[in-house]
């Protein structure tokens, strides 16, 4: 195979022979490598003429590139050679085979990304400036149906629906709603909301009667926006008018999201006022539950801000509430989470105990300093000394007596009983109930020496109390009299049973 049949000629062939086989190596490409490449293409059923153009090299790579990672050494060498030839056709400067592989990988990834973006948006503009409609991808529909089956109607379903239907028209939105097989009750609620919004649209945007002259577009009605009485071409025309364009897809999407908000509210029976932190619940988990329920609340931003500033603090447990109140009103959520981190754990309880002990010790020290030193001599106890029941001596007790323990009764000395069962009176005088104290055997000084006569005048008796006491006395007299009469009757009745002695 001569030079006339080569895929590269002239300066391109000179560039090809300057590129190294490996990065940092000494060997470069030669004409024999192109001949070997054409022979390998025959094995794949590809024409060797594809190497003569850049588009032909891209077709070769589209066939061989998916097999590159799991392919043999010959396949990897073929892909590397084709990449080098493609870079020379495209005018990309490279020095080795690895550089060619990297350059083409970057270009391939950019093209795939552009294709993915074009699939996600149904309405696209071509090179001539005309709008073209691409049906919604089945992958998006599958993602939406799977999310509804798993999440039901939780608050996070609404942002996902909004992201999946970016730039969609009413026809695509109806396809998304009709793909939901279950939850037909929720779908009926959604239809009712759409009908209400369509009726309100018809009242605020009356249609022109008769239609616009010259065969122009009519003003869309509520049913046209919902996609029931309009075609795909009409929806595209309304969205892309030069003047006064009406984006029917965005309007219909806002109606659907309004109905979804009502579904989320009905499927979330917990009110935001009922979300309270448990005694052992972490503050982070409580915040997650609080904001999850708050997403389902249909309220304005000001109301939700008030909920965050007041309800989040008031519904916390006492420990977190005390910490949050100490932060002040202007505390952010990040500061709250950082302050309440670890509340309820052993470290937090130990820290609270240490603070309480430090406070108590400080208060006692302040009290001693304020009281000052004690004035006057220290008062010593003057009571009698304790008596040992083992040796009958004063000054110590039997527990600390070193002599052997005395047996028998400690009161009379008998061996057949103990002191507690001794029938003889105690030889020593017993201690009073106040025990030994500084007052000695006599009564303490706080006992009054004699009864003090009150100097205040006696309380006046109220008439009602006086009458009540009088009736009580009369009642007691009547009860006593009735008891005596019963006794006399019993006596007379008993006398009738016996005859008089004859």
Curated annotation (Swiss-Prot):
Modifications the protein undergoes after translation, according to the UniProt entry: Capsid protein p24 is phosphorylated. Specific enzymatic cleavages by the viral protease yield mature proteins. The polyprotein is cleaved during and after budding, this process is termed maturation.
Coiled-coil annotated residue ranges, if any: none
Lineage, please?
Viruses, Riboviria, Pararnavirae, Artverviricota, Revtraviricetes
Q: Which organism is it from?
A: Simian immunodeficiency virus (isolate GB1)
| Gene3D superfamilies hit by this protein | 1.10.1200.30, Human Immunodeficiency Virus Type 1 Capsid Protein, Immunodeficiency lentiviruses, gag gene matrix protein p17, Single helix bin, Zinc finger, CCHC-type
Sequence motif: Nuclear localization signal, positions: 26-32
What job does this protein perform? Matrix protein p17 targets Gag and Gag-Pol polyproteins to the plasma membrane via a multipartite membrane binding signal, that includes its myristoylated N-terminus. Also mediates nuclear localization of the preintegration complex. Implicated in the release from host cell mediated by Vpu. Capsid protein p24 forms the conical core of the virus that encapsulates the genomic RNA-nucleocapsid complex.
**Other observations noted:** This is an African mandrill isolate.
| Sequence motif Nuclear export signal, residues | 16-22
Q: Which protein are we looking at?
A: Gag polyprotein
Lipid moiety-binding residues (N-myristoyl glycine): 2
**Zinc finger boundaries on the chain: CCHC-type:** 386-403, 407-424
Where is the site described as Cleavage found in this chain? 367-368, 432-433
PTAP/PSAP motif, short sequence motif: residues? 454-457
